[in-house]
UniProtKB/Swiss-Prot annotation:
Family: Belongs to the ATPase gamma chain family.
Quaternary structure annotation from Swiss-Prot or TrEMBL: F-type ATPases have 2 components, CF(1) - the catalytic core - and CF(0) - the membrane proton channel. CF(1) has five subunits: alpha(3), beta(3), gamma(1), delta(1), epsilon(1). CF(0) has three main subunits: a, b and c.
Gene name of the record: atpG
GO biological process: proton motive force-driven plasma membrane ATP synthesis
Upper classification of the organism: Bacteria, Bacillati, Bacillota, Bacilli, Lactobacillales
Protein name: ATP synthase gamma chain
GO cellular component, one term: proton-transporting ATP synthase complex
């Protein structure tokens, strides 16, 4: 049965209201994306310096003699995966993408569910793994849209404490890396234990420093220097991953809201065409009835 003019008009009004919402959300997401991109650029200056120091340390004898708990290379009995997702929906394929790729990464490395646990940053990931019976040993919800460095300290403190207490023996950070405003790429980076090879490889990704063999004179002592540098390195990895993931999240949300707005425009145009045709048909019917009535009177 064909829709009445009033039904079509009601759908047009409803779609226009939805379009106003998606358009407003698109503008909000764009503003958040612009803000976090500026913060990410500023953070890169800091993290590049930290990783440069780390790279030089990895080429010296300091790490070889370190007794830092973060470098504990014990046999791996349990692996932890720090999975970064959003707390809410309406972010396009962002969450489904990172969870799909994380599951593939976990299945490849630790196919036995008893051999791993999940540390979830973001409610979507926490709920996803809980509903599937996965051991979610830690969850952190409510990360700011533009996260500050202090937010990460709580996460890093909890994670490193769990590592030191041998709750798990190695940790990977899994998230979506922001490539540009229309695409992101899955990343899984080893965070703990902090070993010489991992530090050197990670630092080399972000610095242009030439390889060198460095000897350091440290004050007040080698151990005290490393007790400061290694936690800063761990914090930089987690904060950088969260900042990167949030940037990808806002980009995905911006694209999703733009797509929803465009779809609403297309639907409104289609409904308007149906409305015009229905109205024209109603007018034609009314004219026909008037003409028929006039002819009946004349006869």
């Amino acid at each position: 049965m064909a829709e009445s003019i009033h039904d079509v008009q009601r759908r047009i009004n409803s779609t226009k209201a939805t379009r106003q919402i998606t358009s407003a959300m698109h503008m909000v997401s764009t503003a958040k994306l612009n803000k976090i991109q500026k913060q990410a650029v500023g953070y890169q200056d800091y993290v590049s310096k930290v990783k440069a120091v780390v790279m030089h340390l990895s080429q010296s004898h300091l790490l070889d003699n370190s007794s830092s708990s973060l470098q504990s290379n014990r046999p791996v009995k349990k692996t932890a995966y720090l999975v970064i997702t959003s707390d809410r929906g309406m972010v396009g394929s962002y969450n489904s993408s990172v969870l799909r790729d994380t599951n593939a990464f976990i299945k490849e490395r630790t196919p036995n569910p008893d051999d791993y646990m999940v540390l979830a940053v973001g409610g979507t990931g926490a709920d996803f793994y809980k509903h599937r019976g996965v051991n979610v040993a830690y969850e952190y919800r409510g990360v700011s849209d533009v996260p500050e460095f202090n937010e990460v300290r709580e996460i890093v403190k909890t994670v490193t404490t769990m590592f030191n207490n041998e709750v798990f023996d190695e940790l990977f950070v899994c998230y979506n890396h922001f490539v540009n405003r229309i695409s992101s790429r899955f990343r899984a980076e080893k965070m703990l234990p902090v070993d010489k090879e991992t530090m050197s490889t990670d630092a080399a990704k972000d610095t242009q420093a030439a390889p060198l063999t460095a000897e350091y004179d440290t004050e007040p002592s080698e151990e005290e220097v490393l007790q400061v540098v290694l936690p800063q390195y761990a914090e930089s990895l987690v904060y950088g991953a969260i900042l990167d993931a949030k940037t990808a999240e806002h980009a995905s949300s911006t694209n999703a809201m733009q797509s929803a707005t465009d779809n609403a425009d297309d639907l409104i145009a289609t409904l308007q065409l149906h409305y015009n045709r229905a109205r024209q048909a109603a007018i034609t019917t009314e004219i026909t009835e008037i003409t028929g009535g006039q002819e009946a009177l004349n006869n």
